[in-house]
Structures are given as structure tokens and as C-alpha cells.
């Protein structure tokens, strides 16, 4: 089950580019440099989620490394999106991962049925879940099932990338009526101050 990089027929061994014998991924360092210093690899050829936006971020980072600039991709801040109905989007850690890592945490959820825009448009299926560190309140993960999830996750990516707290999201003024208010309400639920949650 899943996908694997198709590297075995590329002649990489003959070129001297090392691959992982089990996964087929090209072995790279933190700069995306392969075992041949003038060859770089990104995207589906290297470990990590096989997503176009992850490959784009790695391509930019590799170019920055080649130019001698600092380069980094925060793999914890790469969104995953499933284009189904309803849409599914997530970034950061899941509640199961947080539990397995024994990290103290709090969660807040909010149903789209409580968002005025969702009700007006008849798109009330799903909810938003915010997972925050139990002591620092730093956002650890955001998960959305529902309308516009693919677009809404961008705010969650920013929160994870820049170490925002659930309070930061809760205190950010969101337009009304919007689907994004459900994210604000979920963050407010972490803070136990949701306005519309029952």
C-alpha cells in the first residue's frame, strides 16, 4: 500500500548516486545534495510526503543552498489535503501522535454547523480541530473536515510554521460570515472561551 519512488531504472548506481535499498529514495543531506556533490534531489525521490507543494518547497530550499543561503523546509508544517466531499486537510501532529510522544495537550473543536456562512450555503458537514501544547499553548496540529478545508488549512500552516498559540488564532479577527470562523471558534474552544460552542 502506498507509493514508492521509481529510481531503480534511472541508472543512479552507475552515476554514483546512492539510494536507500529498501525504499528506493535517493539519499540526500540537509541541503538536498546527493552522494555526488553536484547533484541534488527533491520531491518524490527523497523521503517525506509525496506532495507537489512539498517538492516545490524543497526545490526552493535546494536552490537557496546552492546559492549559499540558509535553507530549510519545516516538514511539520506541510499541509496534507484530500479533495473529497467533504474536503479533508491537516497540518502538524494528530492527537494520536501527540499521545504517543507523551506531550501534554489540549484540544478544541467546532462544527461547521455552527458557522453562519456554512449554514447559509447548506455546507454544514464536518468540523475543525485545534491541538495545542498543554503548557505553552503552541499549536501542534490543525485538522479540518468540511467545506473549504483545502483553503482554510493555510492559516493552520502559518500557525505551525511560526509557532503561534491557539490564543493567537482565537484573538485574530476573522471576517463574518466566513468558513474560517470555525477555525477561530475551535481555537477559542482550546481556550475555553468559544462564543458559539454549546
Regions found by a protein language model. Give the residues of each.
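Short, flexible turn/loop "capping" segments at secondary-structure junctions
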Residues: 34-38, 74-76, 134-136
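Flexible, glycine-rich terminal cap/loop adjacent to redox cofactors
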Residues: 67, 83-94, 99-198
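FAD-site-proximal beta/loop scaffold in flavoenzymes
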Residues: 1-66, 159
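A short alpha-helix-loop-beta-strand transition element characteristic
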Residues: 4, 18-20, 69-79, 103-108
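Short beta-alpha connecting loops at secondary-structure transitions
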Residues: 43-47, 80, 168
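Short secondary-structure boundary/capping segments
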Residues: 30-32, 73, 80, 120
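Rossmann-like dinucleotide-binding cores of NAD(P)H-dependent redox enzymes
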Residues: 48-56, 64-97
Amino acid at each position: 500500500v502506498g507509493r514508492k519512488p521509481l529510481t531503480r531504472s534511472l541508472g543512479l548506481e552507475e552515476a554514483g548516486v546512492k539510494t536507500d535499498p529498501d525504499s528506493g529514495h535517493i539519499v540526500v543531506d540537509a541541503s538536498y545534495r546527493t552522494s555526488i556533490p553536484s547533484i541534488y534531489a527533491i520531491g518524490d525521490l527523497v523521503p517525506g510526503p509525496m506532495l507537489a507543494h512539498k517538492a516545490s518547497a524543497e526545490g526552493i530550499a535546494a536552490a537557496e543552498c546552492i546559492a549559499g543561503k540558509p535553507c530549510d523546509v519545516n516538514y511539520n508544517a506541510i499541509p496534507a489535503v484530500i479533495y473529497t466531499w467533504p474536503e479533508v486537510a491537516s497540518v502538524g501532529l494528530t492527537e494520536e501522535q501527540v499521545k504517543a510522544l507523551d506531550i501534554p495537550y489540549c484540544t478544541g473543536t467546532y462544527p461547521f454547523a455552527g458557522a453562519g456562512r456554512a449554514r447559509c450555503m447548506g455546507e454544514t458537514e464536518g468540523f475543525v480541530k485545534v491541538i495545542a501544547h498543554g503548557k505553552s499553548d503552541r499549536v501542534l496540529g490543525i485538522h479540518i473536515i468540511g467545506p473549504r478545508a483545502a483553503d482554510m488549512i493555510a492559516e493552520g500552516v502559518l500557525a505551525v510554521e511560526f509557532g503561534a498559540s491557539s490564543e493567537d488564532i482565537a484573538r485574530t479577527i476573522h471576517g463574518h460570515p466566513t468558513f474560517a470562523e470555525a477555525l477561530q471558534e475551535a481555537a477559542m474552544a482550546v481556550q475555553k472561551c468559544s462564543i458559539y460552542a454549546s
